Regions:
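Chalcogenol-based redox active-site neighborhoods
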Residues: 16-186, 193-197
Length: 197
């Protein structure tokens, strides 16, 4: 009831069958953890494959309405920052009970939506645990030294893109690329809980 009440006050409500989860807000300055995970073509992609001055790691999935609501905005960001910032999407959901998040469905979505970034499958869920990811979407921005600079929401209105007034992830990326500190409060991302095994 408390969660429902809070969300109504924020102007939206959540299906009773959905578990709304808030990001754990991992400590700033934490290092990016190494990984080697298959993309939608079955090719392994590693942390070391990314060499831009900024790296955005996003834990997401196909079926979550929160993830789907911001998907087009993430694609726009990925296109806007090509050559300046690397983006990588990772799905860590267990797929026996959530078949829409299977590698086959991930490949379909990657192609249909023309993702400008790789979409990786974390079958063991070890990468999500290493990063401290708990929800979809859960967003982490790292600097050129792969230290965490930002962990928070994409913007200030996940549900209504036309009413967004603060694009916080874009603001954070711009700060990192220019070598400036992120000088605004970082608000936790919220979404569906990662579906653990």
């Amino acid at each position: 009831l408390g969660v429902f009440k809070r969300n109504v006050l924020n102007g939206w409500c959540v299906s009773i069958s959905m578990v709304l989860t808030e990001s754990t807000m991992v400590k700033l300055g934490s290092p990016a953890h190494g990984f080697s995970l298959p993309d939608t073509n079955g090719k392994n992609v590693s942390l070391s494959d990314f060499d831009s001055d900024a790296l955005v790691v996003i834990f997401t999935c196909n079926h979550c309405p929160y993830a789907k609501a911001v998907e087009d905005r993430l694609i726009l960001l990925g296109n806007d920052y090509q050559g300046q910032t690397d983006f990588v999407l990772i799905s860590s959901n267990e797929i026996e009970n959530f078949p829409d998040d299977s590698p086959e469905k991930m490949a379909e979505r990657h192609q249909t939506k023309a993702y400008p970034f790789p979409y990786l499958f974390d079958e063991s869920q070890e990468v999500a645990k290493a990063y401290g990811a708990v929800c979809t979407p859960d967003i982490f921005l790292y600097n050129k030294d792969r230290k965490l600079e930002y962990r928070g929401r994409l913007d200030d209105n996940w549900k209504e893109p036309e009413n967004v007034t603060r694009e916080e992830l874009r603001m954070a990326i711009d700060a990192v690329l220019s070598g400036n500190e992120i000088d605004f409060d970082q608000v936790a991302s919220m979404g569906c809980n990662i579906k653990w095994k």
